[in-house]
Design a protein with these regions (language model features):
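Conserved beta-strand scaffold positions in the cores of enzyme catalytic domains, especially
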Residues: 7, 20-22, 48, 81, ...
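Hydrophobic beta-strand scaffold residues
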Residues: 7-8, 76, 130
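Hydrophobic alpha-helical segments within soluble ligand-binding/sensing domains
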Residues: 23-48, 63, 88-97, 116, ...
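An alpha-beta-alpha
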Residues: 32-72, 185-198
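Short beta-strand elements in bilobed, periplasmic/extracellular small-molecule ligand-binding domains
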Residues: 48, 66-92
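Flexible loop/turn connectors
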Residues: 96-97, 101-200
Length: 200
């Protein structure tokens, strides 16, 4: 970098050739596994309510979703994949759009618990029950103020700890400070797939 200062990035960029230190979740694999689980449960019409389309993590999650569909010979229109800011209102709005499709999805994968809460509100408004009428899998960053820590979690989730990613990032930064000449390192974390009551 121009300032010649050590740094570590949480996440990755697909648009740079310069090597740098990073820690990231294996987003492609996480959303492949989530979509594959829904397919194994018998779902064939699966929506994805994703983050902003130009964000690296969202692109990788869409790739995982599409790969699972392709490997199971499931073809879905582009309308089943939506993008937007990861907010509760966007989760709500995009869920309603999916539910208004001629063949609405029986399952949805989404990028955050905040958006999942919006999906849940949309289901309530349509008098549909989460987990019974529509299955939902969300990504969970394991943030304490959104913790889904019931004995049986509300949401089935791909869970990856932001706290652990922060610890690993700090370790990488200390290594870079101690040895400025060391080659940059990337750490790719696998998310856990946690079963909750939102899938059937």
């Amino acid at each position: 970098n121009n300032l010649n200062l050590p740094f570590v990035v949480h996440g990755r960029s697909s648009n740079t050739v310069e090597k740098y230190n990073w820690v990231d979740v294996n987003n492609e694999r996480s959303f492949f596994r989530a979509t594959q689980l829904l397919i194994e449960l018998g779902h064939t019409t699966i929506g994805l309510i994703n983050g902003l389309a130009d964000m690296d993590f969202a692109m990788r999650r869409a790739q995982g979703y599409r790969r699972a569909l392709k490997e199971n010979n499931i073809e879905l229109a582009d309308a089943y994949l939506t993008h937007g800011e990861m907010t509760e209102p966007n989760g709500y709005k995009n869920a309603l759009a999916l539910l208004d499709l001629p063949t609405p999805p029986t399952a949805v994968v989404t990028s955050s618990i905040i958006m999942a809460n919006g999906i849940r509100r949309a289901l309530d408004d349509r008098e549909l029950k989460l987990g019974r009428d529509v299955s939902v899998i969300t990504h969970d960053d394991d943030l304490s103020y959104f913790r889904d820590a019931a004995a049986v979690p509300v949401y089935t989730a791909t869970r990856s700890s932001v706290r652990e990613a922060g610890r690993l990032s700090a370790d990488l930064l200390l290594k870079a400070i101690a040895d400025p000449g060391r080659d940059p390192e990337g750490i790719l974390l696998d998310a856990e797939l946690i079963l909750g009551s939102s899938t059937k």
